[in-house]
Amino acid sequence: GALYWQLNDNWPVASWSGIDYYGNWKQLHYHAKRFFAPVIAVCVPDKEKHLEVSVSSDVPRPLSGSLVLRIMDFSGTILKRFEFPVNLKAQEAATVRKLDIAELAEKPDEVFAYLELKLTDGTTEYTHYNDFFFTEYKHCNLREAGIRHVLERKEELWHLTLESDFPAFFVFAELK
């Protein structure tokens, strides 16, 4: 099991909560929605410089499908692509593959892994997306991102669209 500390704030304050006092989701809550999903795919490096690609299911039925792993640069170019079959028993976790990190990422600060898991029990389809960075975010060799915004009013709602020509980690928009 897991404990989610702390879900929300009971007054306006800077805190570790996933939801602020006004009910707005913070970055943590978006991540929590992903890591508490019924099926997940993750990459975990080991001490021998391998990358364990694993999947986990909380679904009480057997699942089958595939896991696609893409090694991409920060401009979105796919450098390598792998597809692995996945067959899980009910509520099972399993390592799908163990890969050599040196063969995946010659320049760890210029690439990342993107995972796309699609499983079904014959009735329901489950999808999960995840990523793995071979180095800390602060060491990623990113180009300067130009972020453009469009703010439109449609009937009673405002719509904010952000676009970037290159990755821009952890962009936050605040409307007042």
Regions found by a protein language model. Name each.
Residues 1-176:
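Carbohydrate-binding surfaces of carbohydrate-active enzymes
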